[in-house]
C-alpha cells in the first residue's frame, strides 16, 4: 500500500496547487513485456504474466491500465493486470468518482453499457478506425462527426504522455520482478514520479 499512498500524497499536493483537476478522465492501457525465458530457479515463466495479441504481434507480460486527468494528463489511478485482460474490463475501475466525462480509444466501445458503469459519467469513445475511414468528408453530417473524432483524439493524446515518461525518462520498458503485486507497486510509484516530472516547471515557478 506504500506505493498507492505515495501516489495519493503527490496528487493531493498537485490538487492543492490547482494542477490536477477532476472534471474528466482519460483511460488507456499498455502492455509491458516480461521475460519469456525459463532459465531461472523455477525453470518456468512467471505464472502471473500472460500472452496478449496487439495487432498481428504476440506479447508476453502484464498490462498497465491508467486513469489520467483529461485536462493535464496527470495520472490518478493505476491498475496492473495479466497481459490478456482486455482494456474495457478495467475501464470503469480507472475512474476516481468525481468526473462527469471520460474518454477512451476504440477498445473501450460499449463501456457505458457494462454492469460496473457509472450512470453519471458520459463516455466519449473513439469510433472504430474502419468506421471512421468510411466517413464521407464531403457530407456535412459525416464531416461534423470526423471533427468530433479529432477533438476526442486531442484529449486522449494526453494519456500517452505519462506512459512516455515512465518508459523514456525512467527507463521502464519491461517488468523487473516476478508477480503482479511488486510490478504494479513499482508502476504506481513511477506514475507518481511522472506526475511530478510532468509539472516540474510549474512547481519550480511556484517556489518562486
What are these model-derived regions, one by one?
Residues 167, 171, 197, 201-204:
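Hydrophobic alpha-helix feature that most strongly marks membrane-spanning transmembrane helices
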Residues 1-119, 128, 188-194, 200-202, ...:
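Polybasic low-complexity intrinsically disordered regions
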Amino acid at each position: 500500500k506504500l506505493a498507492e499512498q505515495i501516489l495519493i500524497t503527490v496528487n493531493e499536493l498537485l490538487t492543492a496547487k490547482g494542477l490536477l483537476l477532476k472534471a474528466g478522465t482519460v483511460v488507456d492501457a499498455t502492455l509491458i513485456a516480461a521475460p519469456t525465458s525459463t532459465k531461472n530457479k523455477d525453470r518456468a515463466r512467471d505464472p502471473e504474466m500472460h500472452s496478449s495479441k496487439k495487432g498481428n504481434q504476440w506479447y508476453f507480460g502484464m498490462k498497465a491500465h491508467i486513469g489520467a486527468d483529461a485536462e493535464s494528463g496527470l495520472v490518478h489511478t493505476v491498475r496492473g493486470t495479466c497481459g490478456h485482460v482486455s482494456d474495457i474490463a478495467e475501464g470503469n475501475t480507472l475512474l476516481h468518482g468525481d468526473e462527469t466525462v471520460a474518454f477512451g480509444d476504440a477498445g473501450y466501445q460499449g463501456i457505458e453499457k457494462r454492469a460496473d458503469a457509472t450512470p453519471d459519467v458520459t463516455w466519449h469513445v473513439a469510433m472504430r478506425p474502419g468506421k471512421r475511414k468510411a466517413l464521407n468528408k464531403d457530407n456535412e453530417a459525416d464531416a461534423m462527426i470526423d471533427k468530433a473524432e479529432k477533438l476526442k483524439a486531442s484529449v486522449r493524446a494526453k494519456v500517452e504522455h505519462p506512459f512516455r515518461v515512465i518508459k523514456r525518462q525512467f527507463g521502464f520498458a519491461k517488468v523487473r520482478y516476478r508477480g503482479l503485486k511488486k510490478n504494479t507497486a513499482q508502476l504506481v510509484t513511477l506514475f507518481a514520479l511522472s506526475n511530478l516530472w510532468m509539472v516540474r516547471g510549474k512547481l519550480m515557478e511556484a517556489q518562486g
